[in-house]
């Protein structure tokens, strides 16, 4: 099924930007790539772990999918930093905004694809994030606290912001410390919003829980048995990524890392990873529902045909 209106997407007062969001294993990449092919678009990843180099299997980069009928689909915000480097919401927003401008300047459609809600929200709601400089004295004090203690501090100071964090952010001490620094800096509010210069259309892939659970299980098995996920974690650790750092990335990296440290056996690792992945998907659904209650309009779809019907109406509007 073809898109009716192929045109230069920057020729609007508010240029159009498409978003494809959803839970883990929902099929976001496949749909996003197909839409990019149909719409002459490019993908901007909105995944807090896909920015890291060498973390391919566990983050589901699926780079082999970025090709349709022999044509490569260009992507952005994938493989941009080392796993040992710091990467936060402000950096993501800045890089993604530059990618949006670049894509539009070339007359193509930016398509944001991912499941990290806060990354997507920072773009759609146009957060004005703080540029506060690190407070080394305060940072030294915060580094003595555990992850739960850091998160509880954030809840006390900025509850609305804290509840929007994804699991990766909640378990990442570096990010929690940075958020606390920004909030305590007295500079810009961490989530001050400005009117967006873009016309966003948000599509959400919504799979029934039973189907999603089957897909999550299959993905875990495939990653472990066919895609050498354990070897990926071994290589990351061998190349200097600490066990603690791997654990902060959550899910596959956390549980495979613990398995490699002999904290439990292989079967237990799969069981723990499966349970954590199902819970993660539920939290993602809850996060998007909460965002809808705040006023965002997410068009929930089941497949590509449903997406194209909504997109055609969106493109027909000036």
Language-model-detected regions and their locations in the chain:
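Phosphate/pyrophosphate-binding catalytic cores of soluble transferases and nucleic-acid-acting enzymes
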Residues: 1-318
């Amino acid at each position: 099924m073809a898109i009716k209106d192929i045109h230069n997407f920057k020729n609007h007062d508010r240029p159009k930007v498409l978003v494809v969001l959803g839970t883990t294993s929902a099929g976001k990449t496949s749909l996003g790539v197909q839409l990019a092919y149909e719409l002459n678009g490019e993908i901007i990843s909105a995944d807090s772990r896909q920015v890291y180099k060498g973390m391919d299997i566990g983050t589901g980069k699926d780079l082999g999918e970025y090709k349709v009928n022999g044509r490569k689909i260009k992507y952005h915000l994938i493989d941009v930093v080392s796993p040992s480097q710091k990467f936060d919401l402000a950096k993501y927003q800045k890089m993604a905004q530059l990618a949006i401008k670049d894509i539009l300047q070339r007359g193509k459609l930016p398509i944001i694809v991912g499941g990290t809600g806060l990354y997507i929200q920072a773009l759609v709601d146009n957060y004005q994030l703080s540029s506060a400089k690190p407070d080394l004295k305060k940072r030294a004090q915060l580094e003595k606290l555990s992850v739960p203690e850091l998160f509880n501090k954030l809840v006390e100071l900025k509850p609305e912001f804290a509840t929007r964090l994804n699991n990766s952010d909640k378990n990442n001490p570096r990010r929690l410390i940075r958020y606390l620094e920004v909030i305590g800096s007295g500079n810009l509010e961490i989530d001050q919003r400005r009117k967006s210069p873009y016309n966003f259309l948000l599509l959400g892939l919504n799979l029934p829980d039973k189907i999603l659970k089957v897909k999550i299980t299959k993905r875990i098995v495939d990653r472990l048995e066919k895609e050498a996920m354990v070897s990926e974690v071994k290589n990351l650790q061998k190349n200097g990524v600490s066990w603690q750092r791997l654990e902060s990335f959550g899910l596959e990296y956390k549980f495979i890392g613990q398995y490699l440290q002999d904290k439990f056996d292989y079967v237990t690792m799969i069981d723990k990873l499966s349970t954590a992945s199902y819970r993660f998907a539920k939290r993602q659904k809850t996060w998007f529902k909460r965002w809808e209650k705040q006023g965002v309009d997410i068009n929930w779809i089941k497949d590509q045909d449903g997406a194209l019907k909504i997109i055609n109406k969106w493109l027909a509007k000036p």
